[in-house]
Amino acid sequence: MMRIALFLITNLAVMLVFGLVLSLTGIQSSSVQGLMIMAGLFGFGGAFVSLLMSKWMALRSVGGEVIEQPRNETERWLVETVRSQSQQAGIAMPQVAIYHAPDINAFATGARRDASLVAVSTGLLQNMSRDEAEAVIAHEISHIANGDMVTMTLVQGIVNTFVIFISRLIAQVVSGFLSGNRDEGESSNGNPMVYFAVATVLELVFGILASIITMWFSRYREFHADAGSAKLVGREKMIAALQRLKTSYEPQEEGSMMAFCINGKSKSFSELFMSHPPLDKRIEALRSGEYLK
C-alpha cells in the first residue's frame, strides 16, 4: 500500500509541476487541468483494471486449471513445493495451476502478494528435473514476494499517463495553431479532425518509445527474481534451470502476463523491447552474484 501511495504522490507532483511550468510559459489553456485528470484516470485506470483481472485473464488465455485437490504425485509435489517456498518467502500460499503447453514455462500473476497465482506448463513438469522445476517455481515466488506485479502496474500507469497527456497537449497546440484559433470563445482543441489525428499518431509513437522504459524495468525485475530464486533454492539450481530453458521452445504467452513468464529467449527484435534479458546474461549475473548482494 505504501508503494502505491508513493507512486501516486510522485506522479501527481510531477504533473502539478508540469502544469505550473506550462502556466508560467503561457502555454497552459483552461482545459489543461482537465486533460491532466483525464490522462491520469485513463492511464492508471486501464493498468489497474488489467491487474485486478490478471488471474482470470491469465487462466483463460492459457486454459489453465487451478489445482483444488491434487490428483496425482506430480500435482502433490507441485502444491507442496509452492507451499514450502511461499512460507520461506513470507507470503500467503498462492493458487497453483497447470496449463497444457509443450513449452517449458511458468508465470505468476495477481493483484496482491497474498492473493496471487503461480501456473506452470505441462512441458515444464515433463521436461525439467525436480531441482530445475524448483528453481523456476522459486523465480515466480520471488516475483510475488517482490511485489513485481503491482510495481509494473504502477510503472505502466505512470507511462500511460504521460503518453496520453503529452500527446494530447501537443495535439491541442498543433490543431489550434493550424486552425488559426486565437479567440477565447473558440474550442481550445482547434480543428477536431486535426486534433484527433495528431493525438492518435503521437500516442502511437510515444507509446512505442515508452515501452522501452517498461521493458527495461521488466528486465531489471527478472534479474532480481533470478536472485530471489537462488536465495530460496540455491544458485546452481537456478543456473541449471536457465541452461535448460536455452533448449526449450519459445513461450506463447502474450501481453502483460509475458512480463512474469520464466522463459525469455533472445529474439531477433531489438533487446530494448524485450521483457526478459537474454538467458546468457541472466546466467552470467547469477554466476557473478551481481544481484545477490
From Swiss-Prot:
Report TM segments: 4-24, 34-54, 158-178, 193-213
Picking any one GO molecular function of the record gives:
zinc ion binding
Comment on bound cofactor: Binds 1 zinc ion per subunit.
Q: Which cofactor does it need?
A: Zn(2+)
**Which subcellular locations apply to this protein?**
Cell inner membrane
List the membrane topology term(s): Multi-pass membrane protein
**Which InterPro entries does this chain map to?**
HtpX_protease, Pept_M48_protease_HtpX, Peptidase_M48
- Enzyme Commission number(s) of this protein: 3.4.24.-
Task: Give the positions the UniProt entry annotates as the active site.
Answer: 140
In terms of Pfam families, this protein maps to: Peptidase_M48
Positions contributing to Zn(2+) binding: 139, 143, 222
A single GO BP term for this record reads: proteolysis
List the GO cellular component terms.
plasma membrane
| CDD domains associated with the record | M48B_HtpX_like
**Keywords annotated in UniProt:** Cell inner membrane, Cell membrane, Hydrolase, Membrane, Metal-binding, Metalloprotease, Protease, Stress response, Transmembrane, Transmembrane helix, Zinc
NCBIfam families linked: PRK05457.1
Instruction: State the family named in the UniProt similarity comment for this chain.
Output: Belongs to the peptidase M48B family.
| Official protein name in the record | Protease HtpX
Provenance organism: Pectobacterium atrosepticum (strain SCRI 1043 / ATCC BAA-672) (Erwinia carotovora subsp. atroseptica)
Q: Which gene is transcribed and translated to give this protein?
A: htpX
